[in-house]
């Protein structure tokens, strides 16, 4: 029998395409989804929910509604942005379009709740302008990344919420856009073309498939492929839920935690409503509001640009919420502390307005806010290797945050044989930051290129830890080594916190680091003693770096004295000086977007194979002097005296 080879080729292609769709079919079809076929609205809103919201926005949700209405009014006045190819900072990603997707839900919801035609007309205008943009990202990114994820989500909501009011012409234009944009994103994610398709621990995947799913939910019953636009995100998010660690912390930092949690929650709430599936599984989700709580600065120091600990690629201000996120978590887990923190964020005016409309859906006014006053002042996030330690919860406390763990956490390191999304991690094992008297005393480098030298830790022959040397952390290197820097001890009493960690595995084998054990003695309220026990296979040039918040200082005897803008004095004193040289200078480091970063750096240097170094940090507010720390050795034991207290380290 003769067989036409070209027909075989066609058949093979069809089988592959069918397999790709079959993998993401909803089988069996969830009853909740089947029940909404032919009805709108269905995403978060239903006719009953609309009636309920029209009542609550005049009572329990009135203040939250005023914020939403103000943002909707502002969007009406300014109109949608004109297309521009280059926004001057985000390159091919065209991230200016994210705000378009973020704004449309405000207008759509205001239209539904007020029935004011101004909002419907503005929502339609914003939506049609979005559809008309010639690109959603440039080149290979067009239609494949964050600007698409945001716009798909926003357009899906207006299509669903304002379905009747839009008219068939606008609905048809939206459907055409969905078929083009959502269809392309689905194919890219399903086929592996999208670089983020298996980045299960990274914000790009979460944002993009959430946007895709919203379109699928909105169009289910109207387009055959809508089922698969739901099924693919469901498969991806199931894998993410299995991969998240146990402690609620994020390797990407608090800013990307906000971004990722917003879009995960958006999908998870829809999955509960329309798929009957609860994805709030495992230990990560009930613990993650605590990550936000412990990584925020003392609240009396909060400002819009300074309220978070900026580990990893992170701003000090908020990107997304976190009031909305905290209210969602509070409602899901009946968490009064998350409810309290959301209120504090709103009261301080430090919230980011990207999706404040979610407050109307996620706020439970019957849940009593609980301040954190009965929480421990120290929390060890054991999977990610982060310890947050503070003197109290007064709002004026001192805060020290320490990091020493695998780049994606202990759990994920054992699961993945490729990097599932560690690009925003920093090479910073055994690094710490310090905030006291309302100011940064020892700082992080922020959202920058990835260099260990920009952190408060060890260099060996001028080299840092595995993964450094580029704009994005090169996680495949420590992953292949299964490098597990780790925290060994984290204990707290009223007067003293003790943290011990070993970062030796963060360094490449050629560095010869056999031990880099860091002991931190937080002598509350105003002293920190750092003891480093370093052992190498052979003598190397070793350098311990510390980066004060103030950008200048002076030497006073053996100590370095720095003063902040508000007058706080920080005293840094090397205590074990035999064979150690010290320096204090401005180091020009590699910042973000090619900009220089100037870091005032206090450093200790020694060429040796064995080094036990002790450094004391003490501080005092304006008008007072930090207490000096004295030091004595007794064999292998080290004793430190701060005022009338003596603490020590014994082998």
Regions found by a protein language model. Give the residues of each.
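An acidic intrinsically disordered interaction segment
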Residues: 63-72, 107-125, 163-181, 217-235, ...
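Well-ordered alpha-helical scaffold segments within catalytic/enzyme domains
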Residues: 39-59, 101-117, 129-137, 151-169, ...
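Mature N-terminal, pre-catalytic/accessory segment of carbohydrate-active enzymes
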Residues: 1-66
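Long, well-ordered core segments of solenoidal/helical folds
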Residues: 61, 68-80, 121-138, 173-195, ...
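Active-site lining segments of carbohydrate-active enzymes
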Residues: 82-92, 143, 150-255, 266, ...
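Internal amphipathic alpha-helical repeat/solenoid segments
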Residues: 72-99, 132-144
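Extended polysaccharide-engagement surfaces of secreted carbohydrate-active enzymes
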Residues: 256-651
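Beta-sandwich/jelly-roll carbohydrate-recognition scaffolds of carbohydrate-active enzymes
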Residues: 60, 68-83, 375-378, 385-388, ...
């Amino acid at each position: 029998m003769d067989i036409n080879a070209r027909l075989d080729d066609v058949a093979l292609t069809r089988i592959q395409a069918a397999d790709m769709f079959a993998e993401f079919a909803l089988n069996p079809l969830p009853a909740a989804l089947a029940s909404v076929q032919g009805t709108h609205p269905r995403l978060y809103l239903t006719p009953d929910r609309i009636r309920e919201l029209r009542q609550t926005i005049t009572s329990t949700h009135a203040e939250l509604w005023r914020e939403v209405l103000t943002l909707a009014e502002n969007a009406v006045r300014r109109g949608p942005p004109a297309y521009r190819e280059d926004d001057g900072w985000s390159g091919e990603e065209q991230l200016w379009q994210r705000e378009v997707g973020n704004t449309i839900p405000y207008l759509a919801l205001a239209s539904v709740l007020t029935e004011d035609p101004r909002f419907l007309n503005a929502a339609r205008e914003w939506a049609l302008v979005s559809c008309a943009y010639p690109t959603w990202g440039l080149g290979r990114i067009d239609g494949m990344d964050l600007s698409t994820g945001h716009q798909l989500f926003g357009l899906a909501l207006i299509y669903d919420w304002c379905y009747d009011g839009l008219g068939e012409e606008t609905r048809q234009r939206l459907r055409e856009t969905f078929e083009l944009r959502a269809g392309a994103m689905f194919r890219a994610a399903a086929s592996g073309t999208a670089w983020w398709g298996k980045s299960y621990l990274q914000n790009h995947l979460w944002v993009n498939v959430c946007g895709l799913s919203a379109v699928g939910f909105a169009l289910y019953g109207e387009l055959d492929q809508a089922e698969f636009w739901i099924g693919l995100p469901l498969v991806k998010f199931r894998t993410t839920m299995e991969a998240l660690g146990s402690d609620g912390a994020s390797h990407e930092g608090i800013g990307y935690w906000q971004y990722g949690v917003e879009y995960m929650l958006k999908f998870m709430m829809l999955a509960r409503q329309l798929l009957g599936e609860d994805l709030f599984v495992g230990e990560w989700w009930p613990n993650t509001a605590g990550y936000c709580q412990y990584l925020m600065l003392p609240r009396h120091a909060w400002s819009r640009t300074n309220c978070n600990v900026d580990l990893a690629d992170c701003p000090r201000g908020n990107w997304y919420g976190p009031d909305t996120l905290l209210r969602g978590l509070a409602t899901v887990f009946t968490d009064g502390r998350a409810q309290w923190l959301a209120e504090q964020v709103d009261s301080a005016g430090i919230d980011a307005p990207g999706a404040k409309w979610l407050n109307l859906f996620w706020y439970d006014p019957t849940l009593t806010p609980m301040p954190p006053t009965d929480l421990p002042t120290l929390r060890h996030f054991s999977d990610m290797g982060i310890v947050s330690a503070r003197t109290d919860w007064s709002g004026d406390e001192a805060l020290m945050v320490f990091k020493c763990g695998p780049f994606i956490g202990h759990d994920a390191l054992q699961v993945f044989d490729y990097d599932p999304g560690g690009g925003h991690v920093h090479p910073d094992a055994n690094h710490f930051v310090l905030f006291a008297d309302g100011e940064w005393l020892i700082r992080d480098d922020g959202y920058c290129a990835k260099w260990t030298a920009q952190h408060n830790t060890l260099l060996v022959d001028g080299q840092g830890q595995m993964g450094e040397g580029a704009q994005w952390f090169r996680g495949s290197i420590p992953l292949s080594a299964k490098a597990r820097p780790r925290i060994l001890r984290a204990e707290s009493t009223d007067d003293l916190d003790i943290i011990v960690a070993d970062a030796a595995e963060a360094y490449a084998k050629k560095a010869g680091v056999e031990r880099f054990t860091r002991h931190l003695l937080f002598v509350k309220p105003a002293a920190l003693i750092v003891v480093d026990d370093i052992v190498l296979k052979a003598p190397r040039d070793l350098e311990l770096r510390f980066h004060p918040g103030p950008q200048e200082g002076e030497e006073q005897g053996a100590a370095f004295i720095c003063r902040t803008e508000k007058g706080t004095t920080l005293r840094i004193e090397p205590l074990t000086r035999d064979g150690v040289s010290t320096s204090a200078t401005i180091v020009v480091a590699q910042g973000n977007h090619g900009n220089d970063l100037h870091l005032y750096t206090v450093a200790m240097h020694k060429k040796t194979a064995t080094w036990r170094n002790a450094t004391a940090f003490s501080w005092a507010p304006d008008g007072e002097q930090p207490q000096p720390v004295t030091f004595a050795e007794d064999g292998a034991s080290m004793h430190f005296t701060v005022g009338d207290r003596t603490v020590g380290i014994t082998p």
